[in-house]
């Protein structure tokens, strides 16, 4: 599939596609939009037809240096006001740090950052605080030990108090399984959910993140399995695509690679009406075309 070969249809500027009463709420990562100050960035997201955004403060804000000390109620309320004025939901507040960092001092700093994001989210009114699932090294890189039972238990043990903290603020934490990280399969994600057993822990499902060169031929099975085992816990769907480059997968815009988007969107349409679907790995030049590809295909499946 390729967005350049798709016959684009005209849709409402709100960034949603209405079909039979169901709505897919499409968003974008704020740092994939051309940089602008917040009071221009969020209106620009709306003008491009997106209904929600995934925002990582350190990647999207350059007017000042975001940090725990800047995450005040006032900043949260300012962003919330801008979003309300422009009809843009905050689907995900990103806090993509390594909860299994083996350095005790760095781990302590990471925990404080998670707590700050949870407090911030409670005022901002976002869908979830999103995170990936870490690695057993300080560099946050792949090594086989990431997939060990010991690594999984480390992640569960370190995530549990974060989720407990989120419960106190009425905030949902959502983990995003990634093949190179500790939670690298649908089954391991289910184990984490069952072990922590909290309604404040849910899933960001990104099918491309669960693929590597050794299992791309099983992508349909993985998508189906995710909607079987994780169905009630999927809060957000990340939408990107992939191409194979050597022994690695390169992430690219949805509809321009090898992912089975008819299957994914059919599942979303059947089981997850109104779910936030945020695009990833777009660039300003193809973001709108990618949204239109998603909307047209969604109307057809």
Please identify what each model-predicted range represents.
Residues 25, 53, 59, 93, ...:
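Acidic/histidine-rich catalytic cores of soluble enzymes
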Residues 40, 77-78, 82-86, 100-203:
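Active-site acidic/histidine proton-transfer and metal-coordination neighborhood
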